[in-house]
Amino acid sequence: MIEVKNLVKRYGDHYAVNHLSFTVEDGQIFGFLGPNGAGKSTTMNIMTGYLAATEGQVLVEGHDILEEPEAARACIGYLPEIPPLYPDMTVEEYLRFCAELKKIPKEQRTDQLTKVLALTHLEDMSARLIRNLSKGYRQRVGLAQAILGFPKIIILDEPTVGLDPKQVVEIRDLIRHLARTTP
């Protein structure tokens, strides 16, 4: 569960986020809609601990994102608007690197990678350099990184950007599947 309480992000006199409060329950799919500059990405960056709020509180599974950042982040898989990919790595190398960063036990990594590659339809791309992938496939690699370890909470910032209409449907179906099946 995520609880956002009176969240404020101010840049000088401009409010990017102005006293926003909401709760997202386990298994719930929750989205932000709004025009460019409405504070959607800013809110997600605060929720994941990548940006500090001016005021307010974010609790992730009961952990305050500022007071217990490691415990809170361990519950979150995050796909930012622009996935932080390493173009000189293969898909598999990158995901193994991410598994190590996420402290997934070594003996579980191969199984985790196999599952994530299958869910994101990247099995045939695992040996390819990320630099040689289309934008749609790079987006899938970012999504695979976010769901690696099957975190309780997955935060996706524009997960279907760069995907063709068929891939958009597949990713939305995957998100619904994860909401139903992720422990």
Question: In which residue ranges do the predicted regions lie?
Answer:
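Conserved ABC transporter NBD signature motif
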Residues: G56-E67, A71-A72, I76
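Conserved ABC ATPase "signature" region
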Residues: R96, E100, E107-M125, R176
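Hydrophobic anchor residue at the start of the ABC signature
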Residues: L143
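A short, proline-enriched helix->beta-strand linker immediately N-terminal to the Walker B motif
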Residues: L148-K152
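Catalytic Walker B motif of ABC-type/P-loop ATPase nucleotide-binding domains
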Residues: I154-E158
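Helical segment within the ABC ATPase nucleotide-binding domain
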Residues: V169-T181
